A protein has these predicted regions:
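Alpha-helical transmembrane segments and adjacent TM-loop junctions that form the membrane-embedded core
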Residues: 2-18, 35-37, 41, 45-312
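The first (N-terminal) embedded transmembrane alpha-helix
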Residues: 18-30
Length: 312
């Protein structure tokens, strides 16, 4: 199980490292395009790209810190750490969206002809393709195992690619109809449409992460799967004392306390608990399963005294 997490962690880190490289290159290219042009969409994209790059860098550093640290140190805190990073990404996207909206409304109230956008148009076109490619890669990672960091990054890159595609379209139409009056409003209007995408992504990221920031028991559907698994393995234990579950970010933790008759050999008890653990891992992939076994008292073993069952 540990090796599986390590491989998954390396895959996530590799995806983020690739994304960071493209982000840094994009900042340089968009910075050059903004210098050559007076386009609001290009300038606003530069501001957004700086925020995106910071968010990707923070996510990458978080995963590296977790991988470098001792496993037991981050056993429960990793979920909170992932969600805090996701919330930070949402806040950065919100701040960038507000800045873009302010500049867009200023440009609508005081229209200005856009010049020198050819290089920016090329950059937007290329990076819209790159953005959709990276987003698709990260969505594939999410299908293997959910992670708040990767979920926020996938949404961020989908939003970024859509924004770049809109900006490329707006700049292309502005060049095509540069002699028409309405072309003066295409640039700021495209920026406002991009703001809507950014606000939606920021809300989705923050709402999902805030809900997971506080540890909580698993939802009823997953608890039912645990009970169904225990029912199928009814002969593998003599008493069920307690079930405790929790979700911390992308990680699921299940703790079972089972009772066994004193005459059962320890080797048999170990085999029984292992069968239950394997069955639970099949219905809860990637979950951390802990099963503790205790000997029944003599009264319990002959059926005279029942035990208390708790599920949390």
């Amino acid at each position: 199980m540990t090796n599986g997490y390590a491989v998954m962690g390396n895959s996530r880190e590799r995806s983020l490292a690739i994304a960071l490289g493209f982000c840094m290159m994009d900042v340089l290219l968009i910075g050059g395009a903004a210098f050559l042009s007076n386009s609001l969409s290009i300038l606003s994209d530069l501001v957004k790209e700086i925020g995106d790059t910071t968010a990707v860098l923070a996510a990458l550093l978080t995963l590296r810190a977790v991988r470098a640290g001792p496993t037991h140190r981050f056993a429960y805190g990793i979920g909170k750490l992932e969600n805090l990073v996701s919330i930070s990404i949402g806040v950065l996207m919100l701040a960038a969206a507000i800045g873009i909206a302010i500049h867009a409304f200023d440009r609508i109230s005081d229209p200005e002809a856009v010049e020198g956008t050819e290089f920016g148009l090329l950059v937007f076109g290329v990076y819209s393709v790159i953005g959709y490619t990276i987003a698709a890669r990260q969505f594939r990672e999410l299908r293997k195992e959910y992670s708040p960091i990767m979920a926020s990054q996938a949404r961020l890159w989908m939003s970024k690619a859509t924004f770049d595609a809109l900006m490329a379209t707006a700049l292309g139409l502005t060049l095509l109809f540069q002699d028409e009056t309405f072309s003066l409003y295409l640039d700021p209007c495209a920026a406002l449409i991009g703001v809507v995408f950014m606000l939606h992504s920021a809300y989705a990221i923050t709402a999902a992460s805030v809900g997971d920031l506080l540890d909580a028991a698993l939802e009823e559907s997953l608890q039912f799967e645990i009970l169904r698994c225990l029912a199928l393995h009814f002969d593998d234990y003599d008493e069920l004392y307690r079930i405790r579950t929790r979700r911390s970010g992308s990680r699921i933790y299940v703790e079972l306390a089972l009772g066994y008759a004193p005459e059962r050999p320890m080797a048999a008890v170990s085999d029984h608990t292992e069968r239950i653990r394997v069955a639970l891992v099949e219905v809860l992939p990637g979950a951390d399963i802990t099963i503790s076994a205790a000997a029944l008292s003599r009264a319990q073993s002959i059926g005279l005294v029942g035990s208390e069952f708790k599920m949390a």
